[in-house]
């Protein structure tokens, strides 16, 4: 009997198996090259936006302070001018948000999370200019807001802009570049590339669709945005507190205690934010005129507070190294902490375009320093350096509120360049996260997104309920 095929030898079988394995390995990762190229473009665009936004805010603040310095000798001029300038700047931000892009209000991070789940729209053509110019107004007014929220939202919208400009149709490209822009935005805001990556993977874990394509895109976008940022601003740490000593092992229990305290503080802080948001909604009732007026009053108040006690207002980055160095007494630290909690709640809870990262980091630094000074007083045998507790506190409040401990740890270490404090940071942030979870607290951004979606559904249900009434009016002839 003749055979049309020849039986393979054992060597031929092995060779064929090796060839098949190689082909499977080569074909396993078919990453669309266009997505990776566009991720680099998104990173560059976001980095440039970050540099422009950062410098724009600094310029507005400098011009405001320069104008006040020119009339500093006249009390009759400096106080009214401080109120009026900050009020007008803030009103500009509130007006743009309320009239042109309501989704640009607040941090903007929950909007990106909702967009990643296809639950919130991404209208980049109006969000980017409104968030940019509105943020210049509110942050330039000296309000207690951060720059990172606007950067994350503008970065995510930049990703969607690139998708639309280059007509990328695949859902994978739309999702990957949206996440890439968000990560690149955080990286550009804090000069913290690894924290930008972890923020998307950890904090947005419910929305982020983990795949080889998406993770590579995020890496590339973060790298390019960081390169752009460092090209213009240098490679130094964004918060310079100096090199602190490592924490002795016999003091780790104090860091755990600090984490427990911050866990409770984080839950209370989040609850107060939600109550403040509800309070402002009751005040303005959706009327944009009332909202703009409220924003003007808040901005003017921050302008006056800047003259009375400058540490109570502003983003807080300038305050962090001063507080961490132990330049305030425990009583003064607690006073500043309470004052900044109130101003943070009012500014962020009102819906002003601006983030809460920086104010939160400042609050953590202040309370952490107060705790460290207290420990140094009660436990002199440990030789405690209060600044180490300040650094741990920065990450702990973030971890308890946002419920992203790994991001909080890496973010603070990258920002301060004190990597030797990683062990006390882990202990503090883990303790804060566990206590916050035990107390039933909800992650800040996820809770804000849930509230936004609930309002969206309520508005939709109201519209649907009104439709039959419109159809049955006498004017319809029915």
Curated annotation (Swiss-Prot):
Recorded GO MF terms: antiporter activity; voltage-gated chloride channel activity
Ranges of the Periplasmic topological domain: 70-76, 233-252, 310-329, 377-386
Motif stretch (Selectivity filter part_1): 106-110
Membrane topology: Multi-pass membrane protein
Motif, Selectivity filter part_3: chain positions: 355-359
GO cellular component, one term: plasma membrane
Binding sites annotated in the UniProt record for chloride: 107, 356-357, 445
Transport as UniProt keyword: yes
Catalytic activity of the protein: 2 chloride(in) + H(+)(out) = 2 chloride(out) + H(+)(in)
Subcellular location, record wording: Cell inner membrane
The keyword Transcription is assigned to this record: no
Marked site (Mediates proton transfer from the protein to the inner aqueous phase) residue numbers: 203
Intramembrane feature spans: 109-116, 177-189, 193-201, 387-401, 402-404, 405-416, 417-421
Cytoplasmic face residues: 1-32, 117-123, 167-176, 202-214, 282-287, 439-478
Motif Selectivity filter part_2: positions: 146-150
Pfam family, any one: Voltage_CLC
Assembly and binders: Homodimer.
Function of the protein: Proton-coupled chloride transporter. Functions as antiport system and exchanges two chloride ions for 1 proton. Probably acts as an electrical shunt for an outwardly-directed proton pump that is linked to amino acid decarboxylation, as part of the extreme acid resistance (XAR) response.
Sequence similarity: Belongs to the chloride channel (TC 2.A.49) family. ClcA subfamily.
Protein name: H(+)/Cl(-) exchange transporter ClcA
Protein source organism: Yersinia pseudotuberculosis serotype IB (strain PB1/+)
Species classification: Bacteria, Pseudomonadati, Pseudomonadota, Gammaproteobacteria, Enterobacterales
């Amino acid at each position: 009997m003749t055979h049309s095929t020849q039986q393979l030898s054992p060597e031929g079988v092995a060779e064929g198996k090796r060839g098949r394995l190689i082909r499977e390995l080569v074909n396993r990762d078919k990453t669309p090259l266009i997505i990776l190229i566009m991720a680099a473009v998104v990173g560059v665009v976001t980095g440039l936006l970050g540099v422009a936004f950062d410098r724009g805010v600094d310029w507005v603040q400098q011009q405001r302070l320069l104008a006040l310095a020119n009339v500093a000798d006249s009390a009759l001029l400096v106080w009214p001018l401080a109120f009026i300038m900050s009020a007008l700047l803030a009103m500009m931000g509130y007006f743009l948000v309320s009239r042109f892009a309501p989704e640009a209000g607040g941090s903007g991070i929950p909007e990106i999370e909702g967009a990643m789940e296809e639950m919130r729209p991404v209208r980049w053509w109006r969000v980017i200019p409104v968030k940019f110019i509105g943020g210049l107004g509110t942050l330039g007014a000296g309000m207690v807001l951060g720059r990172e929220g606007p950067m994350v939202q503008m970065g995510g919208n930049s990703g969607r802009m690139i998708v639309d400009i280059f007509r990328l149709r695949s859902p994978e490209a739309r999702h990957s570049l949206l996440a890439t822009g968000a990560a690149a935005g955080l990286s550009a805001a804090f000069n913290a590339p690894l924290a930008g990556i972890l923020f998307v993977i950890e904090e947005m874990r419910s929305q982020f669709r983990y795949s080889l394509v998406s993770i590579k895109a995020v890496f590339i976008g973060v790298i390019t945005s960081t390169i752009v940022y460092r090209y213009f601003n240098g490679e130094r740490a964004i918060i310079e507190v100096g090199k602190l000593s490592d924490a002795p092992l016999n003091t780790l229990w104090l860091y755990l205690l600090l984490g427990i305290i911050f866990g409770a503080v984080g839950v209370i802080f989040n609850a107060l934010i939600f109550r403040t948001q509800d309070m402002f909604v009751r005040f303005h009732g959706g009327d944009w005129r009332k909202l703009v007026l409220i924003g003007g009053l808040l901005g003017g108040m921050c302008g006056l507070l800047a003259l009375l006690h400058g540490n109570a207002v502003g983003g807080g980055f300038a305050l962090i190294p001063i507080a961490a160095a132990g330049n305030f007494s425990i009583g003064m630290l607690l006073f500043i902490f309470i004052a900044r909690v109130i101003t943070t709640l009012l500014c962020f809870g009102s819906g002003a375009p601006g983030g809460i990262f920086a104010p939160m980091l400042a609050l953590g630094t202040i309370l952490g320093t107060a705790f460290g000074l207290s420990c140094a007083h009660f436990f002199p045998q440990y030789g405690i350096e209060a600044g180490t507790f300040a650094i741990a506190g920065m990450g702990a409040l973030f971890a308890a509120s946002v419920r992203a401990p790994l991001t909080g740890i890496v973010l603070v270490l990258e920002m301060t360049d004190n990597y030797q404090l990683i062990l006390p940071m882990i202990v503090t942030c883990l303790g804060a996260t566990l206590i916050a979870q035990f107390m039933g607290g909800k992650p800040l951004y996820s809770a804000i997104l849930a509230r936004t979606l609930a309002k969206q559904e309520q508005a939709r249900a109201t519209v649907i309920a009104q439709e039959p009434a419109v159809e049955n009016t006498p004017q319809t002839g029915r």
